[in-house]
């Protein structure tokens, strides 16, 4: 018991209102279940919904692509929308092995500051994307992201990590002979719940940062 107790799968049950016989005609073992939570607009340029980790990252990438559409970039850009990031980064492992990139950017979410949270460990909603700084990341790529943000006057925040990033970047960086990797993350509240909250301006500025980096496609 207690607030910190995490229920195991064997402790969970879903009351469907059906009898066992009726339910067996509808579902089978292994069927997935999710919360029927719509995307809800909020005040102050924010939205609430499920799976914004990492739908917001996909939105930022698509926005970045729209910004550079039709432009002649100084590099070849591949986009990977991978699965199972939360269960071992399996999609990222296969994708990076197949693409064999020279440089990889992982776009994800990170913890946004809320009531009672440590401001040292969290980003500020509305403060722009967070650029990862970690010993597992390429400092050259990190510096190039910072330079792109500063050149285009895009607000950004540092996300300092002492080890692994907890993102697909951890897989990218050790693919084959190693890949120079960076992270760009969107501040998000209530992570891994059906009511995650993001600020739209952070998503747009993440896309703007990615586009600015693509126009340079270089490391410092």
Name each region found by the language model.
Residues 1-220:
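N-terminal hydrophobic/helix-forming segments and targeting peptides
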């Amino acid at each position: 018991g207690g607030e910190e107790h995490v229920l195991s799968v064997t402790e969970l049950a879903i009351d469907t209102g059906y009898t066992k016989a009726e339910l067996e005609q509808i579902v089978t073992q292994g069927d997935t279940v999710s919360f029927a939570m719509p995307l809800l607009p909020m005040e102050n340029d924010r939205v609430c919904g499920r799976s914004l980790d990492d739908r917001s990252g996909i939105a930022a990438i698509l926005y970045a692509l729209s910004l550079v559409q039709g432009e002649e970039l100084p590099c070849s850009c591949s986009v990977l929308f991978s699965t199972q990031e939360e269960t071992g980064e399996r999609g990222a492992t296969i994708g990076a092995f197949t693409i064999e990139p020279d440089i990889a950017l992982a776009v994800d979410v990170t913890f946004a500051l809320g009531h009672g949270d440590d401001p040292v460990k969290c980003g500020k909603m509305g403060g722009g994307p967070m650029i990862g700084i970690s010993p597992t990341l390429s400092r050259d790529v990190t510096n190039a992201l910072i330079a792109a943000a500063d050149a285009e006057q895009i607000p950004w925040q540092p996300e300092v990590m002492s080890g692994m990033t907890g993102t697909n970047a951890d897989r990218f960086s050790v693919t084959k002979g190693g890949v120079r990797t960076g992270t760009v993350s969107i501040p998000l509240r209530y992570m891994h719940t059906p009511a995650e909250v993001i600020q739209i301006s952070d998503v747009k500025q993440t896309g703007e940062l990615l586009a600015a980096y693509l126009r340079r496609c270089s490391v410092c």
